[in-house]
């Protein structure tokens, strides 16, 4: 295949989306199911690996081996409080591998474990394939988005996931920045505008404030709640109906995973309906112990169930405004991102908060981030079209960065929300007389003491000549590149001795070897998936051949045209094959092909004889001639294949 354009991928917690900039506009690409967003789900079964819709659709039957929310694990340590609390809610197992979390599943009868990067890489591979199927070209270059609050290690791990998926990640950019780009292209403005991005997705909520002036974006502040989103609204509805079921039928379905799962799916559908209608009905046959559950819910009741959650979305809005030192009257534009912003009540709360200001909903909220990422991909890969020429992108550091100084104090060199790339230098000195070296410990976080912040890495600068305290001058430089990767260096001014560290954050980092290995494994899994597809198609081909053959000889139009002995011979062989199929669903492709040859050996001579004696086929035979499904392995076209008879 020829080389395709660069794409933009929104790798979401619950859903992902891919877009491409071509013919002067962005196209959001639908998957093979016709959906423009794809669930970030990967499932493992005894026979295959499923990604996307196929994985999400079978979650009820296979909950422990269906992995989602990899984004909540990526770039984190196993003992991270977030990982520990999230684990309680996941049906799949998370295990500790030398301090790093891995998800453990049963796949093809074996226990397998995968790093979050590997799971995310499977979703990215799926997004890559969706784009390739649409473009008819290979896709390698991509811009991938992450939440604004992602730290260095999470960004780096996301980049690694791209590498494992065989992508060249041009840049990792913040989701609100991407949404702003999508929006910035739509409405070019001269004077400086303050834009608030309200992103309420499936599992997370982020508020960001940006200023846009002459095509230049600057992120002023970010706030949010990593655990608020559409799924929480679904849960409220699920609990409401579990209680209703208890009242009506005196039975508690909450312990029955499958019943709850079916109820949740129905609730998600009802929630979407309630964004456009004021009432939604739910009908689930045989939900629990044979009881059908037919009920309905009004929009008002849905809003009441979620009243505190909906109202709570305004707190991060206020915090973001405070951080950006802006009053709400100074916000020029409000941009909605994320499927949950379609909920009318949320739109109303937000609009009322901003004193009736119109909200920008022109870009489909599920697609805005991928849309902007696609534009950014076009810019970075050198698209020269008018539309993208005058766009500049400034991202920010999500958390303050600094070093520990005497007494465990956090001394900040780069404040949070600083536009990157950036470089800051500060001079430090020794704390005691004749101190031979200093330990530079790099932290990220907003607390005054380093013990409450997050240690990114440390290194020593030794060989400082003996001197009284306060005399040596040690210059510490923090340098962040456009991808948010941090370099910290320290130089002793008197000797010129230098030491430095690149924080690509080992607390969640994979080594080069790990990544290489995972790239290979990803290839292997892909090959296995291919093999599985071939196997299924040869099985289906054999099955349809056998059933068609049976139908053909049993057709009354053939009465008297085929002798009973021949007919019985074919029926016996067909039934034998059908029985064999029932017992050997998981046989190898070659076995199915062999069985098909055996069947053809019996059928073809009889059918040929029939054909000749009839002077052409009798008209209107059911299903035409057998050999439906994929052509048998003889490389023949469909229809009967003729072979030498032994």
UniProtKB/Swiss-Prot annotation:
Ubiquitous. The modification N6-acetyllysine is found at residues 108, 246, 319, 328, 512, 524, 589, 597, 601. One of its GO terms (molecular function) is protein carrier chaperone. There is a cross-link at residue 512 (Glycyl lysine isopeptide (Lys-Gly) (interchain with G-Cter in SUMO1)). It is found in: Cytoplasm; Melanosome; Nucleus, Nucleolus; Cell membrane. Molecular chaperone implicated in a wide variety of cellular processes, including protection of the proteome from stress, folding and transport of newly synthesized polypeptides, chaperone-mediated autophagy, activation of proteolysis of misfolded proteins, formation and dissociation of protein complexes, and antigen presentation. Plays a pivotal role in the protein quality control system, ensuring the correct folding of proteins, the re-folding of misfolded proteins and controlling the targeting of proteins for subsequent degradation. This is Heat shock cognate 71 kDa protein. The lineage of its organism: Eukaryota, Metazoa, Chordata, Craniata, Vertebrata.
